[in-house]
Amino acid sequence: VLTDAEKKEVTSLWGKASGHAEEYGAEALERLFLSFPTTKTYFSHMDLSKGSAQVKAHGKRVADALTTAAGHFNDMDSALSALSDLHAHKLRVDPVNFKLLAHCFLVVLARHHPAEFTPSAHAAMDKFLSRVATVLTSKYR
């Protein structure tokens, strides 16, 4: 559970990022594919080249889902329920991949917002992204 101070940190930092949803989401996915090539197997139907319209579109969807999560700290389970169902029952994404993508988002945020990416903001974002990953994998059981 995020503390009020952590929620404030996430809201502040993600507020700056959410206006760049497509850019940051695509960058996080590109970093994921480069750093962890096995993750590409879930996207064999997409053009994964740098700057691909499909990667940008999916990156925006991912970032928009994080915006939804950031707006529903106290009811994240219900806010992300459909997305959790999709990933668990249809896409069957290996749960470890959510952690890998979360790390890539942390790198993107640190790169674009170095002044705001303080140790406390880093810790809060990491905790938030871990919570999102937990929610998305909650229906795997």
Swiss-Prot record:
GO terms for cellular component: blood microparticle; haptoglobin-hemoglobin complex; hemoglobin complex. Transmembrane segments: none annotated. Signal peptide: none annotated. Red blood cells. Keywords: Heme, Iron, Metal-binding, Oxygen transport, Transport. Heme b binds at residue 87. Residues 1-141 form the Globin domain. GO terms for molecular function: haptoglobin binding; heme binding; iron ion binding; organic acid binding; oxygen binding; oxygen carrier activity; peroxidase activity. Changing residue 115 to E: In alpha-1 A variant. GO terms for biological process: hydrogen peroxide catabolic process. Pfam families: Globin. O2 binds at residue 58. Involved in oxygen transport from the lung to the various peripheral tissues. Heterotetramer of two alpha chains and two beta chains. Belongs to the globin family. Echidnas have a major hemoglobin I (with alpha-1 chain variants A, B, and C) and a minor hemoglobin II (with alpha-2 chain variants A and B). All hemoglobins may have the same beta chain. The sequences of both alpha-1 A and B variants differ from that of the alpha-2 A variant at nine positions. The sequence shown is that of alpha-1 B. This is Hemoglobin subunit alpha-1.
